[in-house]
């Protein structure tokens, strides 16, 4: 998951992908690095189809809602924001004007703020709509509300892309907690003893494959809007054009 490109291969890159994961509990059957693995998998499959380059991932982020579980490690939102802004600035200095944050963790709310402030130089992917479309394309039986964490979607993606990382037990680990109105204040603990919120028993490699294919296909629209933002910014001073809303402000698909 660490890119091995040479400096020469990077010369003509205009768009970079920064996978942003987490290091947090995912129940007894998925690894702490699940969100990072998913973000990297999405980014790598995108890079096979579009003219972009994948950066090394951010592996620790904002997982404070999981603080009660062993192994979970977090950084502050301010630190994550600073890392993203520093990476974007460094890329611009190297001639790469655009950065897409490929997030595998829904708790990284600050990524949306970084994108909002970037004046069209960043995008956040996947957004809520892309995740929901991926669920539909894959025939997921669990809704996005119910399938919050270590459920059908995440387990399916790992069963497809990295089955060696899925330990036995997911078939009997279903747990639903749709009413999570105090999650930000109280964290995950009041809603699950195992760390799972969802129905991993319904996961399959085929669903993971189809979900990823949907996400890769959807990225083309996000890339086109990001490029259009750049054109609007270059022309705006002369023609009064406005930036195009690409929906980056929407919430992410999981936790």
Task: List each model region and its residues.
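Extended, histidine- and acidic-residue-enriched regions that form the cofactor-binding/catalytic faces
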Residues: 1-98, 104-237, 253-255
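Alpha-helix boundary/capping motif
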Residues: 236-251
């Amino acid at each position: 998951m660490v890119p091995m490109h040479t400096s020469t291969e990077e010369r003509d890159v205009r768009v970079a992908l920064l996978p942003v994961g987490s290091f947090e509990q995912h129940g007894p059957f998925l690894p702490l690095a699940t969100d990072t693995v998913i973000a990297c998998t999405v980014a790598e499959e995108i890079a096979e189809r579009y003219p972009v380059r994948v950066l090394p991932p951010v592996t620790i982020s904002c997982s404070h809602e999981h603080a009660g579980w062993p192994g979970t490690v977090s950084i502050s939102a301010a630190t994550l924001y600073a890392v993203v802004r520093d990476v974007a600035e460094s890329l611009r200095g190297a001639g790469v004007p655009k950065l897409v944050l490929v997030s595998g963790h829904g708790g990284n709310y600050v990524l949306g703020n970084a994108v909002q402030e970037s004046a069209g130089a960043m995008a956040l992917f996947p957004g809520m709509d892309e995740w929901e479309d991926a669920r539909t394309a894959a025939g997921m039986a669990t809704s996005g509300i119910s399938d919050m964490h270590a459920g059908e979607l995440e387990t399916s993606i790992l069963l497809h892309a990295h089955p060696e990382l899925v330990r036995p037990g997911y078939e009997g680990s279903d747990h639903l907690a749709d009413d999570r109105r105090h999650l930000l204040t109280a964290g995950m603990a009041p809603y699950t003893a195992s760390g799972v919120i969802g129905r991993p028993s319904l996961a399959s490699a085929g669903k993971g494959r189809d979900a990823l294919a949907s996400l890769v296909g959807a990225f083309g629209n996000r890339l086109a809007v990001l490029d259009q933002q750049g054109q609007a910014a270059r022309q705006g001073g002369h023609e009064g054009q406005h930036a195009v809303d690409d929906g980056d402000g929407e919430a992410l698909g999981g936790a």
